């Protein structure tokens, strides 16, 4: 499985997930209104949202772009 780790105006950075990590995730962390910090990567299980986080998990290559 290949997941996106960064998505910038210059393109995307990906990583091949290690054995046992068969999900890609994308987490939006709301810092202040109108500003979110986005984290992407591989995971074994879908992370649990904390505070005002929103999380999307998926199982296909680069699905967390």
From Swiss-Prot:
It is found in: Secreted. It comes from the Eukaryota. GO terms for molecular function: toxin activity. Transmembrane segments: none annotated. The keyword Zinc-finger does not apply. Disulfide bonds join 3-24, 17-42, 46-57, 58-63. Pfam families: Toxin_cobra-type. Expressed by the venom gland. The keyword Disulfide bond applies. PROSITE patterns: SNAKE_TOXIN. Keywords: Disulfide bond, G-protein coupled acetylcholine receptor impairing toxin, G-protein coupled receptor impairing toxin, Neurotoxin, Postsynaptic neurotoxin, Secreted, Toxin. GO terms for cellular component: extracellular region. InterPro entries: Cytotoxin_Cobra, Snake_3FTx, Snake_toxin-like_sf, Snake_toxin_con_site, Toxin_cobra-type. Potent antagonist (IC(50)=1-10 nM) of M4 (CHRM4) muscarinic receptors, and CHRM1, ADRA1A, ADRA2A and ADRA2C adrenergic receptors. Also antagonises ADRA1B and ADRA1D adrenergic receptors with a 10-times lower affinity. Negative results: does not show interaction with adrenergic receptors (ADRA2B, ADRB1, ADRB2), dopaminergic receptors (DRD1, DRD2, DRD3, DRD4, DRD5), histaminic receptors (HRH1, HRH3, HRH4), muscarinic receptors (CHRM1, CHRM2, CHRM3, CHRM5), and serotoninergic receptors (HTR1A, HTR2A, HTR2B, HTR2C, HTR5A, HTR6, HTR7). Belongs to the three-finger toxin family. Short-chain subfamily. Aminergic toxin sub-subfamily. This is Muscarinic toxin 3. The lineage of its organism: Eukaryota, Metazoa, Chordata, Craniata, Vertebrata.
């Amino acid at each position: 499985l290949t997941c996106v780790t960064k998505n910038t105006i210059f393109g995307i950075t990906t990583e091949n997930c290690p054995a046992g990590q068969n999900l890609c995730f994308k987490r939006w962390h709301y810092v202040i209104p109108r500003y979110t910090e986005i984290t992407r990567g591989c995971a074994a299980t879908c992370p649990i949202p904390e505070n005002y986080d929103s999380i999307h998990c998926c199982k296909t290559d680069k699905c967390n772009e």
